Amino acid sequence: MGNKMIKLIDLKSLQQFKSKGFELNDKKIFAVFKDGQYFVYENQCPHLGIDLEFMPDQFLDADNALIICSTHGALFEIQTGQCVSGPCQGDHLELIESKVDQEFLWVSI
């Protein structure tokens, strides 16, 4: 995106939801909390360029272990965005630059 950092969400809320979608400057992104870490990706499957979630803020599989594309069931590693199963295997989600402070997750726009 850019290099101006904006506040996206408070950390406690994201920890509760596990994943959450946002729209910033007409760009759809989503954040995921896993194992004490925060990851932010563009909400776009590399296969067809469509949104990933099947319901608002539902980006993870039933075990909250992988990001899933609702259209063709492609599975992505949360930590890397790498597609490990499905029609885009070997491709990856676009990582959005982010940082955390004591209370909030910030993203670069």
Which residue ranges define each predicted feature?
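Zn-dependent metallo-beta-lactamase
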Residues: M1-E23
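Rieske [2Fe-2S] iron-sulfur-binding domain
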Residues: G21-S108
